[in-house]
Amino acid sequence: MEVRHNWTVAEVQTLMDKPFMDLIFEAQLVHRKYQQANHVQVSTLLSIKTGACPEDCKYCPQSAHYRTDVDRERLMEVESVLDAAKKAKNSGSTRFCMGAAWKNPKERDMPYLLDMIKGVKEMGLETCMTLGMITAEQAGELSEAGLDYYNHNLDTSPEFYGNIITTRTYQDRLDTLSHVRDAGMKICSGGIIGMGESASDRAGLFVELANLPQHPESVPVNMLVKVKGTPLEDAEDVDPFDFIRLIAVARIMMPESAVRLSAGRESMNEQMQALCFMAGANSVFYGCKLLTTPNPDEDTDMQLFKKLGVNSEQVAQKPDQIQEHELLDRVAERVAARPNKDDLFYEASV
């Protein structure tokens, strides 16, 4: 399998329709050719500005268009962000991602954002931001400050996109990705599964990503988290096997990219997550919350990694150089002390 940029939707649908075992086997072969086996990269995501977003993304509890339980918060102080980054590093993350609920960053906010980037970089962490649409000039400023990654998801296929968002065009998203790449930063871009899209739309999303001039370095695959108050609160559940298939397809189509299990992981049981890793996922967000939605806690993740024999990148880069077996033993003790060990499992149907 060679790295390609000329996929078609029909070709991807044929790939998706392969027998499950054959597809997973093919994805694992590709994974071991291009990626480090039994290895997961760990990132932490912090919401640095929450709620009151003018966009109308139907999946998002931070949109000002919908009534949800998300509290509106102003842009965090730089020192508060740096304190959170220190905690993330001490918990084992190697990349610190900062997200702001904006259509686009205002010029008055740029100095604070640049200081956040510089401060996090000084800790030895990789940096990532998601701030909405950015101009070429803003991309240059972020890059000069040391930003490693910029996240801007395509969300779904061009054909289905208008059913989910009307306040930002698909081309707006592609233009932002172009600005990011031209500024020399790495791209984090993926989509959301479970918004009512068809199999063809799912294939179309991955075609758009894989046919970019250069594949995104990181491809987050989100499973919709249904939030009360949003138009998609009653969306149909995603079939776990369909989701795992899509992880495998992403791995085959973008073999050199990190494929990240992102939102929705809280509702996946251990077995589903294990199959996702087998299908080629090799990155996760670490911590109990992703922006405003739940995420498995750190102890649970480390326990799962231990069961699977997975080495997380974060262990070797802990500031105090705690060895992996020592950390895992401590985690096991903490988990064993819990009153209910069933907390290690999640119902995929929830």
UniProtKB/Swiss-Prot annotation:
Recorded GO MF terms: 2 iron, 2 sulfur cluster binding; 4 iron, 4 sulfur cluster binding; biotin synthase activity; iron ion binding
What EC number is given for this enzyme? 2.8.1.6
Q: How is the cofactor bound?
A: Binds 1 [4Fe-4S] cluster. The cluster is coordinated with 3 cysteines and an exchangeable S-adenosyl-L-methionine. Binds 1 [2Fe-2S] cluster. The cluster is coordinated with 3 cysteines and 1 arginine.
**Which parts of the sequence bind [4Fe-4S] cluster?**
C53, C57, C60
Give one Pfam hit by family name: BATS
Q: Which intervals of the chain form a coiled coil?
A: none
Cofactor names? [4Fe-4S] cluster; [2Fe-2S] cluster
Q: Which GO terms fall under biological process for this protein?
A: biotin biosynthetic process
- State which pathway it belongs to: Cofactor biosynthesis; biotin biosynthesis; biotin from 7,8-diaminononanoate: step 2/2
Q: Which Gene3D superfamilies match?
A: Aldolase class I
Matching CDD domains: Radical_SAM
Which reaction is recorded as catalysed by this protein?
Answer: (4R,5S)-dethiobiotin + (sulfur carrier)-SH + 2 reduced [2Fe-2S]-[ferredoxin] + 2 S-adenosyl-L-methionine = (sulfur carrier)-H + biotin + 2 5'-deoxyadenosine + 2 L-methionine + 2 oxidized [2Fe-2S]-[ferredoxin]
Q: Which SUPFAM superfamilies match?
A: Radical SAM enzymes
UniProtKB keywords: 2Fe-2S, 4Fe-4S, Biotin biosynthesis, Iron, Iron-sulfur, Metal-binding, S-adenosyl-L-methionine, Transferase
Q: Does the keyword 4Fe-4S apply?
A: yes
Q: Please name the SMART domains in this protein's record.
A: BATS (SM00876), Elp3 (SM00729)
Please list the residues that bind [2Fe-2S] cluster.
Answer: C97, C128, C188, R260
| Function of the protein | Catalyzes the conversion of dethiobiotin (DTB) to biotin by the insertion of a sulfur atom into dethiobiotin via a radical-based mechanism.
Tell me the subunit arrangement. Answer: Homodimer.
From the Swiss-Prot or TrEMBL record, give the protein name.
Biotin synthase
